[in-house]
Structure formats: structure tokens, C-alpha cells
Amino acid sequence: MAETYQPSLRAQILTRRTYNRALNEEGTQFETWAHTVARVIEHQRWLWKRQLRRPLNKTQEAELEELRGLLLARKVGVAGRTLWLGGTEIAKVREACQFNCAHLEIQTVDDMVDALWLLLQGCGVGVTPKSGGISGFTQPILDVQIIRSTRQDKNGRETNLETWNPETKEWTISVGDTAEAWAKSVGKLLAGKYTAEKLTLDFSEIRPAGTRLTGYGWIGQGDETISVAYRAIIEIMNRRAGQLLRKMDIHDICNWLGTILSTRRSAEISLFEYGAPEWQEFAVCKKDYWSKGQPQRGMSNNSLVFYQKPTRAELRGIFDLMLASGGSEPGFINGAAALNRAPWFSGVNPCAEILLGNRAFCNLTTIDLAKFKDNPSGMHRAIYIIARANYRQTCVNLKDGILQHSWHENNDFLHLCGVSLTGVVRRPDLGPYELRLLRNAAIMGAYSMADELGLPRPKNVTTLKPEGTISKCYDTTEGAHKPLARYIFNNVTFVKHDPLVNVLREAGYTIMPHPNGSGDWVITLPVAWDDVEFETVNGLEVNTETAIDQLERYKLLMDNYVEQNCSITVSYAPAEVDAIIEWLLQYWDHYVGVSFLLRADPLKTAADLGYPYLPQQPVTKEVYDAYVASLKPLDLESLKAQSEDAVDMGNDCAGGACPVR
């Protein structure tokens, strides 16, 4: 019998919002966790049976039941993509939708089509812009007409329709109402080199906003975002008429494509080589981007790639740029160390935990170390089982009629896995030896699955991802990060019509109107970490780690567990920059890339900082205990579900541009 686990209310809310699919068209009935897990297991069975070309035997079925038990107990997790889409029909025909991570160099129109296709499926996409293969319009097109959709149903034409009239010089692109049509439409827009005097973009076939997409399960945007993005792309193509697009032009087009599915579903990272043309413009392109009329630039995390070890002065210069732009960007990646770990390296995914080639994917899994205290054999068995599941998730057919064939070829060669750890700071007993044993168990699991299937072994297996969402769902600390404090009030935004608001109000939760005047609500959810060490400062037990403390944990994991990269956000104060630079110069060969974020003072209240509330507010044990004692028990799975996208738990990474779950 599978072990049961009773998650916290916060975990239930986030699981419902992020991974439990709607069971009806109205979006009022949702899966339970057991339903979601059953769907994942069916997806695993389907992948395994397809590869074997026969039904599973008793031993193989028993392994799936073992995996089911680990998932139900929230001890291991599969990719967020698989939790959301695994077992659905769309996952069997658009198999790229199962991948968290992708990267490609953008040099041709076909590459741009691939990027939009992946973004539309919810994949996190890393891009390296390359000039020389995409040009602007033949001549500026000054007469641009946008025809918006007024449809009230979702039965629009599924394909694009393009016409060119050489007599009237009118070029028309009518966009169809499918993801395939949208992806191909950007190809038509970028590839058309007509001597046009008028361009009409017709979106009238697109279904209305607010319609649930049956296959993907999320809410459609209508033509609102795509019409804005395409007009902006036309402006870029006009500006470069008769010229090759610069890398920054390609970067901006990719960012505009990222806005089409909304910030809720799209994640990008853009990479420029340090010292190459346009790197300096790229390095500061997000500074005050909104006030400069470049809202799309908020869509991507931006990083510079060093292929030579930087000097102290160069690192100081990068940190000066970061501090001038808010403390986080541009990030920087050690391309030489990445190539040592992954000779195929061309770039990374948005959170930078996977070292990817050009047109390469990776799928992720995780294990919660905190649920295996005093059970090392169970921990090793669990990571072995989830690594085998991870390999099966790489056994996909990517020949979907949109992606270039090399995506499929590269995946067949690399079979990249991403077996990650979470709850790391809850297991300080795991030193170098124990971490190497875990790494070996994961590698053995993935290798054994490959050998049984007669397929290439994965070129890399272990990683460490930020683990933001899955860790909240599993009631554990996030990846290699240490929480802000032992006792936290997590203030969470709920939309105004969410039926959970009244339920939580009746249960005694603190609820206040959102200060933005939208009618939404902010609800206080309590979180505690009893098994993590904190320092007591002014009566609060808070995280006082230095930047070097965090970098040393990164190095420990990189040296002993991680084959790819450990994605962490290092919080720092400006006064620590010199020490960080010294650490980087000393350990540059151990470093691939981290995110940096200016440290928030955990002792400051919202009032101290001039805010109406803080997403996470440290509190004393007495305040925490009194609040928890005042709450009535709830079980979300027994309640009517809220609508999809009803809860905002905040961003999952330092740049705020990676909400891929």
C-alpha cells in the first residue's frame, strides 16, 4: 500500500493551481493529486510500452507502482511539464511539450519558428542570437493594417492563408486558430520579401480570449498579445529593411514572441558571448526597459558567456553593470567550464541548470532529500527509480512537422537527463561522500534504463534546479536555497472571484484587499522550517548566510553531485562584491553560472520598506504559533476547485522570467 502524505494548505493550493488539470469544460472540477499521479504513471507506461513494442511485464509494472508510491508521498517528482501534460492526448502528438528545457541558436527564419512553437507549448527556451541569416523587409512597409478578431466561438480556420498581389502591392497574412498556424505565421512574416506597399495581418479567425485550450488545458489569450507582438516585429523588420538583422534585433523579436503566451507561461534566457559584437548593448538592454518603451525585454533572463577566464577588472565591470540595473543582470556563464562538462555546449535553459547544444532538450526530475532522513537505502533506491523514469521521458518522437529534424537527431544522441535534488539545506549531514553516492545511484538508474532499452546512455544525468514550485508543493526547502527565516507569513494573491477566498476567510486566515485596487485579495499562509539552522537576530530566527557561504554550497554540489549546473540564486550585499570576485577568480574552473540578487533585509517589515505588504514576512515563533492556533483545518481536495491561474505565488527565479513549472 502506497505511503500517504498530508500536504500543507499552501502545498495543496499550489498543486491545484499548477498541476491538477480541469475535469470539465467550465473549469470548476479539478483532479486530485492521486488523479494527477495516475495520469503521470499512464504516461510513463505509454512511453515504456512504445519503446518495447509490447506490454510491460510484472517486474516493469511493479516498478511503475513503486514510482506511483514515491510520487503520492511527494518524495520524488517528475517534470512540471509532465505533471501538467503527461498522459494527455496532446503529449502523444506534440511530444516536445514534455520538455522543461530547450536551447537553440537563432540564425534563420526556421529557428524563429522553432522558438515560437516551443514557447507556445510552455517550454523554457534559451536562445543565442546569431546575425547573418535573417534580414529585414525588402523595403519599408508603411501601410500596415491589423484586423482583430471578433469571434465568439473557437471554430476558426486552422491554417494560415497568405496572399500577395503584385499589381496592388498588397501582402496579406491571415493567421489560423491553432498553435501550428501561429508558429508558422511568424515564419511567413519574417520570410516574406515582397516589394509590398501594404501589409495586412488578419487575426479574425482566432478564438476569443478566455477560452480554455482543450489540449494544453490553460486559458487562451485570443489575438490580444499576438497582434501587439507582430506589430512590434514589423517595426523591427521595417527599421532593418534591406539589411541583415542585428543580434539585438533577433533578441527583441524573440522577446516579443515570448509575450504571446503571456508571462504566466513563457520563459526565456538570451545569451551573448562576452567581447563579441553588441555585447555591451545587450548587457544594459534591460536597464529601465519599461520607461524606454521596450516592455518585451522583461521576458528573458540575460547572460554573458565567457570562453576565457575574466580578469578582476572585467568581473568588477560586470558587477558594476549589475548594480546599476538592480543587482541581477547581466548574469554571466563560464562557457569553458560548460564545455568541459558538456562538449556539445551551445547554451542553457532559462534557469541555466542544463548545458544544452544547439537545438537540444532536457527533461527534469527531482527527489526531496528531507523525506529520507535516517533512510539512506530508501533515498538511493528512490533516486535510482526516478532517474529511470527521467530516461524514459527522453524517449520521444520530435518529428512533429514543425521542429527542424536536428532536434530529434540531437535528442536521440544526447538523451539528456536532469535528476535534481531539493530540500538540500534540510540535510546538512550529506557531505561530499554521500553526495557522490547519490550521483552514482542516479547515473546507474539512467544508464540501466538505457541499456535495457538498447538505446544510447544519457550524456549527462545529474543537475540541481531552482525547485521553486515543486518544492512548495512538496513542503520542502527550494533546491539548494536556504529560506528567509524559520517562521514566515507567505502573503499570496488570489483573484477576486476565487471561491477559496470565502472558504479561507471562514477558516480564520488573514485576508486584505490587494493594494493595487484590482479587487484581488492577499491571504496570509503560514510556513515554518523546524529542521533548518538559523541565527537569532532581534528576536527573529533569520537567514544570515553570506554570499560566500552560498557559493561554497554551490561548489560542494558542483564538485560532488552535479554533472551539468547547479542553479541557485546567490543573495548578496554590494559590500560583498569584492569577496565574490575573489572567490570567482580562485574557483573559476568550478563555476558554470549562478544568479545574483541583492539581499533583502529579513529584519525589515513592509512598513519599514514602504510597502503595503511583503510576499514573505519573517515573524517570531510566538506570532506564528498564535496565528496557526487560530486557524480551522481545511482539506483543499475536498473543496470545489478554483479557476486556473487563480493564485499568484510569485516568481520562481531571480530574474523573474522563469515561471515554467
Describe the residue ranges of each PLM region.
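Extended catalytic cores of very large enzyme megasubunits
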Residues: 1-661
